[in-house]
Structures are given as structure tokens and as C-alpha cells.
Regions:
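Short flexible coil/turn linkers enriched for glycine and charged/polar residues
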Residues: 44-48, 58-60, 157, 167, ...
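Terminal RNA-binding accessory module
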Residues: 247-353
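Short, exposed "boundary/linker" segments that immediately precede the start
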Residues: 1-2
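Proteins enriched for Cys/Gly/acidic motifs involved in redox and nucleic-acid/cofactor modification
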Residues: 6-10, 14-107, 146, 161, ...
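Conserved SAM/AdoMet-binding glycine-rich loop
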Residues: 91-217, 225
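Radical SAM enzyme [4Fe-4S]-AdoMet core and its adjacent flexible, acidic
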Residues: 108-129, 175-179, 239-270
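Conserved, mostly hydrophobic/aromatic
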Residues: 62, 82, 99, 135, ...
């Protein structure tokens, strides 16, 4: 192990620390090496689920983000490296694989050898025992037709996309140094819904970015009400020392940030409840994660459908779980829906999904 660590340091880490003002910024860039082959990663997630990091660093340069300063430009793992890790974990019982990077849709383009996220997925779906593959952090800029096609047609790939949009106002997007316009974002979302009608779209939005006007915020609010995202996270802008956004004029007050955040989340709660109530009567497959006891001897299984990501989305609760255990996949019939969670009953006969 010690030899592997030393070898990894020698091969992969370059100290690029520098002085910024009166502070020393510690930045370590890693070459596109394959950490999995050097030291096999041990997931801290449940034994049936794992996160797979397909790249490190980021090349986007958003004005509010410090990641490129400390992690360097994006460096993708090779397809064989990722396939090797997924094969190993699937042989150990992992069934759900969540692919992550700072910008997953850009994956492979830095390698300049034809590698893309779609081509990686084509290899991952061939692996035995892989049940669900879910995609996170898909920036809209590089979300191309090849990627959409494989998401649509491959059964193992969850019909779920996480696209962190941050905002919809063009003036805010420009100050953020985002590469997409409101028009291109809306065009992509329309294409996703038209191509895959049952796709789940999750996004993350920011309120209170420097210079965000009341009109900008109202545009954002109108946007989410029109699109009706299946899942949405939001946060208030927080200045990161040393980033361009921290030096911008027209910083928004904390009070306004909080008010906008709560208004946005309240609107999304109504949208989520409406979306979930539309699922009543639908049959779906659920990954059981936990068995709950109400204290009176009544058990309930807590799990997730393929359209619910771990930790950030809601859950499905199944009454009378019988012999179900964490890690089991079970067919369930949705009987009720709330703002974030669903209630279902187990399907004991083979009705298909």
C-alpha cells in the first residue's frame, strides 16, 4: 500500500501552489492517471450503491466557483479505468452506479481521442449485474444528441438527468460566465421532454447572485413554474474569497437572498406535489434501502425508484414489505404522493412494469 501511494504521488500530483494577495493558495493538479488501478477505492455508500467519479477538476471557470483554482482543469479517466472499477464493484454486489464529475457531459473531451460520455455508457451497460446507471452534473453545453440517444434507448440507464442550470436570466448567466443562454437551455429541456416523455429532470439553482434584480428573480420563478422540474435544489449565493463574483458590485443582501430562496422552494414544493400526485396509479421498481418500525410492530420499507437519486430526492414508502431486505428490487404500485415522497404497495403478482 505504501509503495502504491508513493507511486501515485510521483506519477499523478503536481504542486501548483501560488501566491494570491497575501495568501498562499495550495493547488495540486493530477495528471489523467487511473487512481482505481493504483489503490482500489472502497465506497462508503451502502453495499448495493456506489458513486463513480469519472473525472476530476473543472474547465468552466464560473465566476462564483473556486473549484478550478484548487482542483485544476478537468481531467477525465479513461473508459477502461471506469469500466474496471464498475466491474469490480458489480462483482461485489453493487447494483446502482451514480456517475459524477464537476461537468459530466464534458467527460472525455479533454483526452482528444474520441472519448465521450455516450461511449463510456455504451461500455458500462454491457457489464453483468449492473441494474441502474444514473447521471449527475450534466452541464447543458455538451449535452448532445449521441448522449440523449443512449439515455433513451438503454434500459440500464435511468431516465433521469441532473442538469445544474444555476439561473435562467441571460444577464445573470453572463455575469456567472455560464456558457449557455436562456434560449439554449429552454431548447434542450424541450428536446429532453419530447424525446423521452417520462424522463426525470433535476436541476440546481442559485438565488442572490451579485446584480440579480427583482426582475431576474421573477424570470427564474416564472421559468420553474413553466418547466415544472421533477426535482430541484436551490441555494443562496455565498461569496468565495478570490473569485471574480466576490469582487462584483451590487452584492445582494442576505435578507433578500433568503426571501428569494424560500419563495423559490415554496413554488417548487407545489410543483413536486403535483408531479408526485400524477404518479398515483403507476407501477414502478423500487430499490429497498431501509426497513422502518412504527413502534407497534408494523413494518414499512423505505426505498427509491429509478427517478429518485440517493440523498437529494424523495423516497418511496412501501407498506407491508414482507420479507424485503435492503438492496432488494421490488415492483410497487404508487397509491399516494406528497411534496417529496411517495406511498406504494408491493406488487406480489407479475404484472410487469
Amino acid at each position: 500500500l505504501h509503495k502504491a501511494i508513493r507511486r501515485q504521488r510521483q506519477m499523478c500530483i503536481r504542486d501548483r501552489s501560488y501566491i494570491h494577495g497575501n495568501k498562499k493558495i495550495y493547488r495540486f493538479d493530477t495528471a489523467p492517471c487511473e487512481h482505481e488501478e493504483l489503490i482500489p477505492r472502497q465506497p462508503l455508500t451502502p453495499p448495493y450503491s456506489a458513486y463513480i467519479k469519472i473525472a476530476e477538476g473543472c474547465s468552466n471557470g464560473c465566476t462564483f466557483c473556486y473549484i478550478p483554482y484548487v482542483r485544476g482543469a478537468m481531467r477525465s479517466r479513461s473508459i477502461p479505468s471506469v469500466v474496471h472499477e464498475v466491474k469490480r464493484l458489480s462483482s461485489e454486489g453493487v447494483r446502482e452506479f451514480n456517475l459524477i464529475a464537476q461537468d459530466s457531459s464534458f467527460y472525455g473531451r479533454d483526452l482528444n481521442d474520441g472519448t465521450t460520455l455516450a461511449r463510456l455508457l455504451k461500455e458500462l451497460v454491457k457489464i453483468d449485474n449492473v441494474k441502474w446507471i444514473r447521471l449527475f452534473y450534466l452541464y447543458p453545453t455538451y449535452f448532445d444528441d449521441e448522449l440523449l440517444e443512449i439515455i433513451t434507448k438503454e434500459e440500464k440507464i435511468c431516465k433521469y438527468v441532473d442538469i445544474p442550470l444555476q439561473h435562467i436570466s441571460d444577464s445573470v448567466l453572463r455575469r456567472m460566465h455560464r456558457r449557455d443562454s436562456s434560449q439554449s437551455i429552454k431548447k434542450l429541456l424541450k428536446k429532453l421532454r419530447n424525446t423521452t416523455p417520462y424522463i426525470t429532470i433535476r436541476t440546481t439553482l442559485m438565488v442572490g447572485f451579485p446584480g440579480e434584480t427583482e426582475a431576474d428573480f421573477k424570470e427564474l420563478l416564472t421559468f420553474i413554474k413553466a418547466v415544472k422540474f421533477d426535482n430541484m435544489g436551490a441555494f443562496t449565493y455565498s461569496a468565495q474569497d478570490g473569485t471574480p463574483a466576490a469582487r462584483m458590485v451590487d452584492q445582494v443582501t442576505e435578507e433578500i437572498k433568503e426571501n428569494r430562496y424560500h419563495e423559490l422552494m415554496a413554488a417548487q414544493a407545489e410543483i413536486s406535489e403535483e408531479n408526485n400526485r400524477n404518479l398515483i396509479g403507476v407501477d414502478t421498481e423500487v430499490l429497498v434501502e431501509e426497513l422502518l418500525d412504527d413502534g407497534c410492530g408494523n413494518l414499512q420499507a423505505k426505498g427509491r425508484a429509478s427517478f429518485q437519486a440517493p440523498e437529494v430526492d424523495g423516497n418511496v414508502y412501501i407498506d407491508h414489505p414482507g420479507d424485503l431486505r435492503p438492496g432488494d428490487f421490488v415492483k410497487a404500485h404508487i397509491i399516494d404522493g406528497y411534496a417529496y415522497d411517495l406511498i406504494a404497495e408491493r406488487i406480489t403478482t407479475d404484472r410487469g412494469i
